[in-house]
Design a protein with these regions (language model features):
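Alpha-helical scaffold domains
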Residues: 1-212
C-alpha cells in the first residue's frame, strides 16, 4: 500500500528506538519510526485521497506507525456518525497508550449530546484502551462548559487492575480538580477512588502546577 511506503520514506531509526522505550509491549520491529508532526502532515494529505478509506478498513495493521496514522486520520473526520463507526471498528485493535491517546476527533466537539452515550459505552468496556479512550473523551469534552457533577461517577466507578486504565482515571481526576474543584474534591476527601488511583491523582494534580 502506498501509505505504508510513504511512512517508510519518513523513517527515523533513532526516533523509533526512542518510541519503543515509551511504549511497553510494542516490539521494536513493529515501529517504523515516524515523528508525529510528519505523521500529522501525512494524515491531512491522505484525508483527501480515496486510499485513506481503504487504509482504515485494512485491519489489523502490521506497524505501530500505521496505527498512529490511523488514529490521526480518524481525528480529521468531518462526519460524526462515520467517525464513531470508524473509531469503534478500530478500538479493538488498539494495544498501546500512544495510539489510544493520539485519537482526538475534532468533530466530537460539535456533537456533545450524541457523543455522551458512546462515551458511557466505551468506559464500560472490558477492553483496556476502549475504556481509556472513553475516559479521555469525557475529560476532553465534559469538564468545561458542558460539565455536570454526575459525569465524575463514570470514571470513579471503574475498578481495574490495568495500569493504563488506572493512570487515565488519575489523569481525569487531576484535571477535574483543576477545572471543577468543588465537584471533584469530595472524591479525594471521601476516599472514593482506589488507593493507587487516589495517590496518583494527588501526585499528578501537584505536578500540573494548576493546583497549589
Amino acid at each position: 500500500m502506498q501509505i505504508t511506503k510513504q511512512l517508510f520514506d519518513l523513517q527515523d531509526e533513532k526516533y523509533g528506538d526512542f518510541q519503543c522505550k515509551l511504549t511497553p509491549g510494542v516490539s521494536r520491529e513493529s515501529i517504523i519510526g515516524v515523528r508525529i508532526p510528519a505523521a500529522r502532515k501525512l494524515a491531512k494529505q491522505y484525508m483527501k485521497e480515496a486510499e485513506s478509506a481503504e487504509f482504515v478498513r485494512d485491519l489489523p495493521h502490521k506497524y505501530y506507525d500505521e496505527n498512529m496514522l490511523h488514529g490521526l486520520l480518524l481525528s480529521e473526520y468531518k462526519n460524526f456518525d462515520k467517525c464513531v463507526k470508524a473509531v469503534e471498528e478500530f478500538l479493538p485493535y488498539v494495544d498501546n497508550w500512544a495510539v489510544c491517546d493520539i485519537m482526538s476527533p475534532k468533530v466530537f466537539k460539535k456533537h456533545k449530546d450524541e457523543l455522551l452515550p458512546k462515551i458511557k459505552e466505551w468506559i464500560a468496556s472490558d477492553h483496556v484502551y476502549t475504556c481509556r479512550f472513553g475516559m479521555e473523551m469525557l475529560m476532553c469534552h465534559y469538564l468545561d462548559d458542558d460539565f455536570r457533577a454526575e459525569y465524575l461517577e463514570l470514571p470513579a466507578n471503574v475498578h481495574s487492575e490495568e495500569y493504563y486504565v488506572n493512570m487515565m482515571i488519575a489523569w481525569f481526576f487531576a484535571t477535574a480538580l483543576a477545572k471543577q474543584w468543588d465537584a471533584a474534591i469530595g472524591y479525594i476527601e471521601q476516599g472514593r477512588l482506589d488507593t493507587w488511583v487516589h495517590n496518583k491523582t494527588i501526585q499528578k494534580a501537584r505536578e500540573s502546577y494548576r493546583i497549589t
